């Protein structure tokens, strides 16, 4: 693949989308540097699982592809936070960024730079980036108000402070992944629930009869074992698009045996309807 990219990139100077996802990583820095040298209009780039790549690739993309909107570097484990921060300073149009498994790159330092520069960011995957803490997530919350999807699964250092900052500042948030974030407590859940109520008037005014449809539509709190049913039920009640019912699971609570009593509105309706059915005579 590396030689193929080296030979073809100079011939496709108007390329806007390039998917280089690999099962057996072959891509090297010189290929990405060639892409950056010739494909200046590139908007969507997938380099996932290219663990041979180093910061050289990020530096090249920063200078050669400033119009990037979507970048997937999940599984690129050799990138550092310095390289990622450098990229963020030049690629300010980024809206979709996948950093899943980029343990060395996704640090609070890098996230602060992303929050400062990438203010159009809408989707960010930080799954299993175990060095991410509250400072980084709060920087995102303050700097990226249009954030709609954030995956923090496995970010074991974050606490309620991260969720509270997101609830208060990211009014467009639709999907939040908190799997195995075991420092999360009821305080975070109530902040999400209350943010829905608190922001209703503001959103109504700003949208002028186009009230923001649904709020949270996906929430993963699996293995967040400190949470209690009343707090999670409050979130479920505040966001009608969160479902626990069969076939529509969007509130994921697996591994939390104490949360089995939490139900969405349609699950309650189904239960009441079933209870109202006449029982057969014996």
Model feature map: region roles:
Residues 1-282:
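The conserved beta-strand core of Leucine-Rich Repeat
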